[in-house]
Amino acid sequence: MNIIINEIIDWIETLLSYTPGKVGTLIRTLWFRYRWKNPASVRVRPLSQFINPKQIAFLGKTSLGKQAFFSADGGSIEIGENFSCNVNCHINASVGGKITISKNVLIGPNVVMRTANHNFDDRDQLINQQGHNFNNIEIGEDVWIGSNCVILSGVKIGKGAVIAAGAVVNKDVANNTIVGGVPAKEIKKLK
């Protein structure tokens, strides 16, 4: 019976994701408020998708751009108040781990955060058969992540940090620091 109910819910959410305009945004916002772990004032734009929404907590006012993708199937996601992400953001804790985003965080378009990575150390076995490893991601308060950035598992980004567009962040970022590049390196400290 649960399979049928889940299938019906998937159909409803797919249809809702394509409903245009302000009415569509209102309907999606009301629908997902019921589905999330912690309902809050979240504006959901078209084509957004939420996998395992009961493990996704929005703690305050939030604005999500079109095609936002949040997956907590196996992990969890917690997002602080006054959060904004632009179009096509991919926030993924699907294999395990937790993504914690503090308050007053801005995320540009096409940003990817993923708590998991493929195992690949055993050269006698295909990579796609070696499973995954995972770790948490933590984003501090008042952080700006520019467009097309990738935040890898195990990373902590400190309060007031700025991640330059296109950066791949594979290690921690200190408070009030600008980083950029592949892999991301410190550009300067903010005062």
Question: Which residues make up each language-model segment?
Answer:
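Short Cys/His-rich Zn2+-coordinating modules
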Residues: 44
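Flexible, glycine/small-residue-enriched loop-and-beta-strand segment within the central core
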Residues: 48-58, 64-153, 182, 190-191
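Beta-rich strand-turn-strand
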Residues: 148-161, 167-171
